[in-house]
Amino acid sequence: MATFAKVMLLLSSVATFGYTFFVVGKLMLFLSTPRSISKAHTWIFNLLDNKSRLETAYGPIVFDTLYLIGFIFQHSFLKSALVKNLWRKLGLAAAERTIYSLTSSICLHYLLKNWLPAQSIVLWQVDVDESAPLWWTFVVTHGLGWAVIFGGSLIMDLPELLGVKQVYYDLKEYGEPVAYKSSELRNLYSHVRHPSFVGLSVILFATNVMSLDRLLLASLLTVYMYVAWSTDDKDVAYQKQQLRNKKHELKAQ
């Protein structure tokens, strides 16, 4: 009976893995699709000349802020010791990361589905449709940003990151996956659980239309990442050492 429950948990974890990829795909389209230019936009510096544009943005900005707060709260609260201890008491310690990934994906999916644009006010706008070099610059910049994020996720062990490996190891009665990693890497993972601050920040701010809602999204998520990702000197030294080791391995080949 216990084995059956673990198998069902593993299937749920695999389903969560697939759902997370689906939501991330929607996030990529949401953040990286070039936005069309509208003459109805009002430059943020001209608000005094057209205050009605600001008034029409109130509603979307309020709701979008609530969506972001909900996502950030979920992302932080489910990492707390209180919640982790709760899963442990319920016998769901192995599913902790799967539950975290699932709830994160649900919150993000809800945010993307209900996001309200506030495009009556813009900080800047660049018409990339009329210029092939600008369009390719936009696409390549975002492509590189996503490549860094996905590459970093693979390096950081994507199945473990999304919780599949923990459930599988529990089914096979192995130790926790993190137990097989070095103490330096475990310390790094406790401070930064997924990449990449620079890559995601570039994607958030490198938009051809910086509307008020996009500015809100980019600013709040960047500040949250900066506060939540608390790397220390040991983490930096560890990553530098790993880079030196990798360069040495490549030269030796």
Swiss-Prot record:
Residues 1-2, 79-96, 162-188, 232-253 are nuclear. One of its GO terms (cellular component) is nuclear inner membrane. The keyword Iron does not apply. InterPro entries: Nurim-like. The chain crosses the membrane at residues 3-30, 57-78, 97-113, 133-161, 189-207, 214-231. It is found in: Nucleus inner membrane. Keywords: Membrane, Nucleus, Transmembrane, Transmembrane helix. Residues 31-56, 114-132, 208-213 are perinuclear space. It is a multi-pass membrane protein. Belongs to the nurim family. This is Nurim homolog. It comes from Drosophila pseudoobscura pseudoobscura (Fruit fly). The gene is nrm.
